[in-house]
Curated annotation (Swiss-Prot):
Membrane topology label: Multi-pass membrane protein
Pfam family of the protein (one): 7tm_1
Knocked-out gene: effects: Mice are born at the expected Mendelian rate, are viable and fertile. They do not decrease their food intake in response to gastrin-releasing peptide. Mice consume more food per meal, but the overall food intake per day remains unchanged. Still, they display increased body weight relative to wild-type. Contrary to wild-type mice, their body temperature remains nearly constant when exposed to cold (4 degrees Celsius) after intracerebroventricular injection of gastrin-releasing peptide. Mutant mice show increased locomotor activity and increased social interactions.
CDD domains for this protein: 7tmA_GRPR
Recorded GO MF terms: bombesin receptor activity; G protein-coupled peptide receptor activity; neuropeptide binding; neuropeptide receptor activity
UniProt similarity note: Belongs to the G-protein coupled receptor 1 family.
Membrane-spanning ranges: 40-63, 78-97, 116-137, 154-175, 210-235, 266-286, 300-326
Gene name tied to this protein: Grpr
Protein name: Gastrin-releasing peptide receptor
Stretches of the chain found on the membrane's Extracellular side: 1-39, 98-115, 176-209, 287-299
Glycosylation sites per record: N5, N20, N24
Organism taxonomic ancestry: Eukaryota, Metazoa, Chordata, Craniata, Vertebrata
Tissue-by-tissue expression: Detected in pancreas and brain. Detected in suprachaismatic nucleus neurons. Detected in neurons in the dorsal horn of the spinal cord. Detected in inhibitory GABAergic interneurons in the lateral nucleus of the amygdala. Detected in approximately 160 neurons of the pre-Botzinger complex. Within the pre-Botzinger complex, there is some overlap with neurons expressing Nmbr with some cells expressing only Grpr or Nmbr while some cells express both. Detected in cells throughout the cortex where it is coexpressed in most of these cells with vasointestinal peptide (VIP).
Cysteines paired by S-S bonds: C114-C197
GO biological process, one term: phospholipase C-activating G protein-coupled receptor signaling pathway
Length: 384
């Protein structure tokens, strides 16, 4: 018996929940039977399982480093730990639910699950994209407006900002929980009826268009547009700083500029990964929403949908490994936590990675330009 794979249909109406439904008849669309291979039933959940395991290892290790290594508890690392927590939430809720539809021909989580799971999943997506926006704002302040940084109670303020991101994300996800329900759907071509967990019934074609466009704007386009503005000013400031730096230079200023470049590059990599991994999922959701009355049973649509979903979940496990490649301090801590390196390594990292406040002023070759570079917790290379 072919599995319940309505993820290849346009009836998949939630970009974060995918298609979790119960066929009243254990049937697959006839067109699909011509090309669907039974091996998909096991291969696809296995890929989901691999993503979950890798993501759990990476994100749990990252959070453990932040909680146990005092020198790593700085402003950007707190945001990144919050990002890792959101990724963990997505991996332990959305990924197993998504994988279950290939192993069972019915919705396994009841009406309560139909309301709770979309809420949790949308909260996680909101935490991810809004935290990336906050990280970009933090890098903007550190590089473009360093004089605005207040060292006192900085970590406490960032904790409040991180908590506010979670609260806003949950508030935005409340409509998903309120309106999601088990709705009946009917496929005319195959004369099949099934029950689908969706945020609206099949009767109104306007609802999916509004829902898909709102999700695309709020959780993708608008945050990425804000991030782009921040990084435009960051890039402009770094270019100007490079031109205005005296020829003889100041070793401390050069190191600080290089450190800020590394931090900005790391956040930009996170943003790029998010944009790349989530764009296909949003595009397919928009396509389905604007072709709601049609049912696409083609192999191309089925495979593209699966790849888009897997790519979206992959985003929840790649950030720790991107950090591993970009940050020497995190790489040392990661090896210590995960690979059980010698105990002395942790102590050395504490002494060499101690937080300090650096202030350096110098005159550029332009007499009217004076730079005062102040930032907390970024003089060392330690950046998770």
């Amino acid at each position: 018996m072919a599995p319940n794979n309505c993820s290849h249909l346009n009836l998949d109406v939630d970009p974060f929940l995918s298609c979790n439904d119960t066929f009243n008849q254990s049937l697959s669309p006839p067109k699909m039977d011509n090309w669907f291979h039974p091996g998909f039933i096991y291969v696809i959940p296995a890929v989901y399982g691999l993503i979950i395991v890798i993501g759990l290892i990476g994100n749990i290790t990252l959070i453990k480093i932040f909680c146990t290594v005092k020198s790593m508890r700085n402003v950007p690392n707190l945001f990144i730990s919050s990002l890792a927590l959101g990724d963990l939430l997505l991996l332990v809720t959305c990924a197993p639910v998504d994988a279950s539809k290939y192993l069972a021909d019915r919705w396994l989580f009841g009406r309560i699950g139909c309301k709770l799971i979309p809420f949790i999943q949308l909260t996680s997506v909101g935490v991810s994209v809004f935290t990336l926006t906050a990280l970009s704002a933090d890098r903007y302040k550190a590089i473009v407006r360093p004089m605005d940084i207040q060292a006192s109670h900085a970590l406490m303020k960032i904790c409040l900002k991180a908590a506010l991101i979670w609260i806003v994300s949950m508030l935005l996800a409340i409509p998903e929980a309120v309106f999601s329900d088990l709705h009946p759907f009917h496929v005319k071509d195959t004369n099949q009826t099934f029950i689908s967990c969706a945020p609206y019934p099949h009767s109104n074609e306007l609802h999916p268009k509004i829902h898909s466009m709102a999700s695309f704007l709020v959780f993708y386009v608008i945050p990425l547009a804000i991030i782009s503005v921040y990084y435009y000013f960051i890039a402009r400031n770094l270019i100007q700083s490079a031109y205005n730096l005296p020829v003889e230079g100041n070793i401390h200023v050069k190191k600080q500029i290089e450190s800020r470049k590394r931090l900005a590059k790391t956040v930009l990599v996170f943003v790029g990964l998010f944009a790349f991994c989530w764009l296909p999922n949003h595009v397919i959701y928009l396509y389905r929403s604007y072709h709601y009355s049609e049912v696409d049973t083609s192999m191309l649509h089925f495979v593209t949908s699966i790849c888009a979903r897997l790519l979206a979940f992959t985003n929840s496990c790649v950030n720790p490994f991107a950090l591993y490649l970009l940050s020497k301090s995190f790489r040392k801590q990661f090896n210590t936590q995960l690979l059980c390196c010698q105990p002395g390594l942790m102590n050395r990292s504490h002494s060499t990675g101690r937080s300090t406040t650096c202030m350096t002023s110098f005159k550029s070759t332009n007499p009217s330009a004076t730079f005062s570079l102040i930032n907390r917790n970024i003089c060392h290379e330690g950046y998770v």
